[in-house]
Every structure is written in C-alpha cells, then in structure tokens.
From Swiss-Prot:
GO biological process: positive regulation of transcription by RNA polymerase II
Binding sites annotated in the UniProt record for ATP: 603-610
Protein family: Belongs to the SNF2/RAD54 helicase family.
GO MF assignments: ATP binding; chromatin binding; DNA binding; helicase activity; hydrolase activity; nucleosome array spacer activity; zinc ion binding
Regions crossing the membrane: none
Helicase ATP-binding domain boundaries: 590-751
Broadest EC class assigned to this enzyme: hydrolase
Gene ablation phenotype (knockout): Not essential, it can be deleted.
Keyword field: ATP-binding, Helicase, Hydrolase, Metal-binding, Nucleotide-binding, Zinc, Zinc-finger
UniProt name for this protein: Uncharacterized ATP-dependent helicase MG018
Extent of motif DEAQ box: 702-705
Amino acid sequence: MTVAEIKKLALNNQVFNEAKALLEKGNVIFPKKFLKRKKIIIEVLDGKVFKVQINLKTAAAHLDCSCSNDKQNCVHIIAALLKYNDLKNQDNKEFDLNKADKLECKEVEILIENVSLAIVNGSWKLKIGFVINIDKVQTNTTALRFYCCDNKDVYFLHTEDEQLFRIALDKFNSVERQTLLIFDQLNKTKQMQYENNSLLFNLDQFLSLVKEVKKPSLFLLNEDKTDNILFLRSQHKINGLSHVCGFLNNKVFDFVSYNEKTKQIVLRLAYLNKFTDFKFPYNINIYKLAFGETLFFHFLIHLKMNGFKNIFFQSDVVIVKESEYLPKMFLTIEFNTQKNKFITDAFFKYKNKNSNTLTTVYPHRYYLAQKTNTSNFNRLLFYEQALQRFYEELFQIDYLRRFENIPIKDKNQIALFKTVFDDYKTIDLAELKLTSNLLNYKQLHFSISDIKALKIEDRQLKIEFKAGGIDLKLIKSVLSNYYKGNAICIGEDGWYDLNDENAKALISFWSQIDLRNATCDANNNLLLAKYHLFEVVDTISKYTDVTNLLDEKTALQLKIASENQFHLSLDNNQINNLRKYQKEGVKWIRALEDNQFGGILADEMGLGKTAQVIFAMLDSYQSTKSLLPSLIIVPASLLLNWKSEFQKFAPHVKIVTANGNFKERSQVYESLKNQILLMSFNVLRSDIKWISQKKFHYVVIDEAQGIKNENSTVTKAAKKIKGNFCLALTGTPIENRLLDLWSCFDFVLPNFLGNKKQFSDQFEKEKNDESFQKLMKKTSPFILRRTKNKVLKELPKKIITDIYVELSEEHQKLYDKQKTDGLKEIKESDAKNALNILSLILKLRHICSLVKDNDVNDFEDNSKANAALNIIYEALENKRKVILFTQFLDVIDCFKQTLKNQKIDHLVFDGRKTVKNRNTIIQKFNSAKEPCVMLASLKAGGVGINLTAAEVVIHFDVWWNSAVENQATDRAHRIGQSKTVQVYRIIAKNTIEERVCQVQNQKQELVKKTLVEDVNFFKSLSHEELLKLFE
C-alpha cells in the first residue's frame, strides 16, 4: 500500500498529519518478526498506549483500534499503516557497508526461493533465486557475508579492494571463509552472474570447487521463507567418504556420500523424506515438485551426465542399486504418416518386489494413481513427473503424454529432436527412441523427362513413368504439408525440406494437377479419371512438347474434344434448321459423350438449349444404336414445352411422360425401352427407388439450378441415377454462390471438383483472381456458355432503363419509420443475426411497392405504381404487349384490381396457378391479337417459359439477385423475338432499393471472373456489411 493510498483511508487531512507526527516521534511500536504473522498488534503512544490490530491475511479489510473513537480509520490506525508501509519498503534494501559502523553491521540471511538447472548459451547453469530477509537480523556480527549490488555481476562488499577483502576474511570462521572464497572465485572467473534476483552458476565449476574444499563448506538455502533451512556441507572424513549433508530443524541429515575407492555414490532417502510430502492430491496435474525433490532430481541428473553409473539408494539400513529402486522410462517420438502427425509414447516400468517381473505405468494417467495396484512396487510419482518435465523441456514439447499430437514446424524442430536424441541416448535416465523417418534427411526429385507417355486406357488417363514409377503417397503428403504452410514433410523413411529447390520444382508441377482421387498401377504409373486429360496436357505443355508423349488414339481424342471437331452422323437436311452456334453446341455435347465425360450447357436463356439437346440425342442414337432409354428431368411447368419441342424437331421419336398416379407411372416404367422419358423433379423425388435401378443412355436435367442444394432430396435422387452420359442445362450455373456450380458438376462429373468442403476451401473461401482463374481453366472444357450479344447478332436489342421515382411525403414517412424502428431493434439485440437484417430489407422493399398493406383500391399516392401504370398505358396505346414482374403477390392483386377498374385486358401468371393453367395463360398471351398486360411473379417467370410476344418488360421491385431478374427478362428477349424489347426497372430514390442497385453494380467484377452469371451477394455479406446498406 502506498502513502497516497493510506492518505485516502484517513478521515481527513488533519487525521493524516497527526498520524505522521506520531510516526516521526517514534510512537509506533511493531512486534519482532511481524512479517511472518497473519495478525499483528501494534502499540501507538498517544497520551496512553492504544493497540491497533491488523489482519495481514485480509490486508486492510480488518483494522481495529482500542481507542474510544467509534469511527473507522482513526489517527492510530493511519499511523500504524504508515509504519507498516515503511518497514515493508525496507525489505530487500541494500546495506552500504562503507557508510555503516562496522561494530553495528548486521548479518542478513539470504533466503533461497528456488534452485533449478537451466541451459544458458549452450552450457548447464545452476540457478539460485533469492531474496534478502531484513526480518532475520542478527546483531553481534562484524560484517555482511555477501551481497549483490547491480544487475550484471555479483560483487561482495568486502571485495571493493583486495586488502579490505582479506581483512574481512579474518572476521569469518573457517566455514564462512571457504564459502566466500568459492563465490569470489566464481565471480572473478565470470562463472557466476546475477539475473532477476537469481545467482547463476556454472554447475561443473561450482561442484569442482566444493570438492576441493578441505574443510567443511557452508551453503545456506531456504525454501519459501520457512524455517526449514538446508545447509549443503561438503566434508572429507578419514575413511575416505565425502559427504554432502542437509541441516533441517537443527538436525543434520546425510544427503549423499561418495567412496572414491569404489566409485560408489549412495543417495540417502532419509533426507528426501524430510523434504517431501507424499500425500498426492487426486488432480496431480497441478502438483508442484517440492524443493527437496527438485534438488534431488537435478543432482541425480548431474551425476548421470558426468558418467557416474555406480549409484545406490539407502533407506534406513538397506542399500539398493538405482535400477532396483527407480523405474525405467521409455520414451518414443514417432511421426505417423497415416495420420500425418507426431505421436509420443511415454511410460515407466517398475521392478516388482521379490520377482523379476515388471509393471508398466503411464505418467499422464495421474488420475489413476490411487487405483494403481502398488503392492508389488513403490511408485515414485514425483520422479515420474520430474523426468517427464525434464524431457519436455529438452524436446520443447508441451506435454509428453501417450498419443499426444505435436504440430509440424520446420527442419529446426527435427534438428532439435536429433540433437537431444544423440546427446542423451547414452545417459541412463530413459530409453529414447526416434523413428527412422525423423533421423534421415532425404531430398525430393522432379524432372519432366521422367514422364514417358500419356494415354487413355479403360476410361482412365495413365501417365507412364520411366524406371521406378512415381511415389504418389509421398507427393500427396508433400502437397498436403505445403498447402498447410509446413516447411517440412515427413515420409515413411525420412523427412524432406520443402524449401529445397528440388522440392519447389516438384510442388510447382504437381500442384497444378488434381491428385485427390489418383491411384497407381502395379508399375507405379499414375492413374487419373479421364476428365483430367485437359489439365494434365496443359500442365505438361508448359515444360515440354506434350505431343511427343501422346499415343495416336489419345492425341485424336484430345484434338476432337478441344477443337470441337466431332463429326455428326446426322445429314445436313436434319440440322439445317439449327443456327451455327447451335450446331457447335450439338458437336460439343456429342464430343463429351464420346469421351465418356459429362457437361453443363450454360447458354444464356433464349438461345435454344432444348433444341441442341434434342439433336445431340438424335445423333447419338443414330450413331451408337443404343437400346437404352434416356431420361430428361425438368420443372413440371416445362413438361409440355419439351414434348412440343420434340414434336417440332423430332416427331418420329417416341416421348413418354411420367405423370398420373404411381400405378400409371409404374406401367410407363415397366414398358420403357429406348424411348425418351420426361419426368418432373417432384416425380423423381417420389420414384427414385425405381429410377435408380434403371440404366439410361442420356440423363439430362433442365433448369439444373434446381439441384444446387446438395442436401435436398431431389439433388440426392438425381445423383443416384445411372447414365452413360449426364448433361445439365442452366442459364444460371451460379445463382447464389459458387457452390451452385460445384453441385451441378457433382452430378455430371462426380468428384471432378472434389467434395463440397474441398471445393469450398479451394475456391469459395479464397475468392481471389488466382483461384477464379484456376476454376475457370479447370471447368472450361466441360461447360459451354454463349451469350445472345455474342452469337445472335440478328437478335433485336434489349434496352434497359432505370426509372427513379421519389416517394410521396406520406409514403416516405411510413418508410422512414419502419427503417428507424427496425434498425433500433436490430442494434439493441445481442444476437448479430443477418436474417433479422434481411427480414427488415424485405419489409422495406415491400413498403416501397405499397403505401400500406392490402391497398387494393387506390394507387393515387403511390409514385412507383403510377410510374409503372404510365408505362403500361403508353405501351398499350402503341399496340405493345407488357409483362410486369414483381416479387409480391399482393402487388399483383393491387395491379389486377386497378387494371380491372380501367377495363384493361390482363392475365395473371404466378405460383397460385396450376401447371395446366399456366400453359394456357402463356398461349393466350402469345396468341392475343390485341395488346394486353401480364402480371407475373418473378419466380414464375424463371422456369423456361416463352413470352416473345411481349415488347415491354417492367420490373416493379428490384430483386436482390439480378440473375433471376435477367432470367425473367429473357422470357421475352429470346429466339423468336423480332422486335426490340424495352426493359424498365422502377426504383424508389432514397430507399433500400437504391442502395441494393449500387451494391450490385459494385459486385459485377465477380461475375466476369467466374465465367457465368450473377451471384446473390447478400447471402455472403456479413452483419456489418448488411447494416451499411442503410447508410
């Protein structure tokens, strides 16, 4: 406690000043040795004697005075605290011998706090931590023994000059003099240093000096400031035995004796028992070695390190060999290449009493200590733990437990293991074992000239190597460690430095090839799935001319697939109705099929993907003469569309549809031969048990974004279907996230992009240019995407216009109130849930569209609705048909009522309509002779329907995902459209709609990098990023 803190405890400044006066007069009297007491009584003279009691255990929380003042912290208490503070501050203060009267010099006890071994600059040091105990003062002494006075070296006040030191030595007895001579010699030879209240000795030098002392030497050590003082005394006796003794509670205990003739060392356990409490707690992990145990153990280690082998232990009158008393430790450190991690195994073996058998115990199982049957041996837990900690420090391992995992670091870690192993394997403390792969350093090898040939065999890509083949397991391990950031790789028979030039060359090459599902043949040639052909050829071509490695068949397959030169068996009359890009699409599909690949046809909506698939199937059946049926899975709303397309392009092909009840569907399945089976997603989900038992020629999924959720029953069902060739059709391969693309590929080319986690770690989490380019390069041979502006030069333009409107005053007030209340609720909530913010965004978008809920009668105060109605009126006057898309069904109802009141022809197309009704509505809209309006929900507009009769498209509420918005627009802007399509987006200024558009515009870069459509960025935005939308 400081003086300032004591002053705060005083009732006022007057009380504090009076207390200081009592202190300065010497009127505050403390008892002797008060520092060791938990409760002390202080006498304060103030007219009479007042007694102040301080409970040191609870500090200043319990203060009491015998004066009549009933107020706390009276002048006597403050005076006592000031005196206590002064005395405490004197602790550890330096005595200046030169300024002191020698007759009044006092002997000060050096209290040793800990004794331990340490390695300093590669040498063993004995470290003794100490404090100077002012409380133990003896008067009747003429000089200080020794004292440390700076932070670098140790000096003795007696040795300020040599003459003064010699004079001082005369004042000591022989034991004290010999002690000082030893410390002074250590100091002069720089073998002793002072660091952080510790004396640091060179252990060998220290012990050798002690041995040379002919008279008893005294070293004063103390544990935890107790009265149990240990004097280590080295003395020679006539019988030739050297002794080091312990002094405890005024009794001397023999610690160790050494017989120079027999070279026999005897450690006496009576000493150890005096300093060790053997009552171990259940939770031994928190057990701290006692002072005696620590000293005993380090002394034993030092003896062994200096070559002493003839060591015995004495208990009472029985002397036994060390091996009979101490357990043997067995320590193994290995690297398990199967689990790719270090594993340690540490245990002790005790010799059983009256037999030559051994009992094994594990040091980490402390909680079993009480249950272990120790009737046949004396278990030394302190020794187990001390030895365990000793090797933990040597190997720099946190815990030496059985099966403990140690992280891989770098070659310095391996060097440390080997150094410790070499230095300590001969010391009879433990039997050390390091597996050979930790002791052998090996170098990796890579040369492109080692590759002998590339060929396709049995639907697999084989990379043949020259003599010796390839060590695939090692290469995978090297790459795995490299990706984890490790600097080394440990194999079966040695370890490798990954920063070595050869390793860098190997990693550079093989990291470009997906080896996750690779295997080897009997000759250690590499076997990969056939679809890896393109990436392997591309990688090798960076190093050498790959054509020299390809056999004729493989080279031809590669040329046909990469240059799209597949020869169709259909004659020109059959495909004359197709456009050039569609013919290329048919060839691309057939080339994939011919090479046993799968693919994704991702042409922009309106480019005729259906026709390309139909002609590819026709060519395939004509060429292969397959007798298997083919399966086409589509949304229910597109069943009739596909059927009509077949009737249009291939009327001779028999089409069957899986509909009706299960009995009717099962009859279709049973009679199925080489027909085309059309099936909806819902039927697939219900009938997958039967479907999965059939084998199909083609398996096609239209609107394949329907299987983007890998956990849905439809997706799982689709991936159970067996087909010779699988094809996915989608205009939006990436609708919400990159995983949508993975799910499609997992259907057409299982394992091509790894599993979900592997794909996410490699591509989705990284989201950088390098990972995007790698993904594009890998997938480009198996995904075909064309856009209308590239392949349909004759297609009329699509003109997009954003119309910004300001909400009316009342409308804006309603919006602002909802926004303020919603944000307040979110910010006051403890949970950072993005769904709460998305829910608020949805509410605000809805308010932008409607002034109030269910306002079905009046659009007069709704500026957005009025803007849309003005566009509708103008379009109808110009004889143009209109589609208005919205997300909200109640908005559709409002427009429906308004148009009805205006007696304007209109149709409604949304999810509330049956599939049959939807097709009728589409036909009615397209065939209507007079201009009319279709009110459609946005999602209903995104499932393959054809609305080319429309010339004006209105998006009433901006959709988060512009890909869905574009998909709806392209129902009008597609093949068959002969007029310019005008697209309007109605956006409310100063609202969330405006912010959504801004964010979408900023994020368009990702679309370009990932080859395909837009991404719903809102699903990937953090809580904080979503809140920024409201700024």
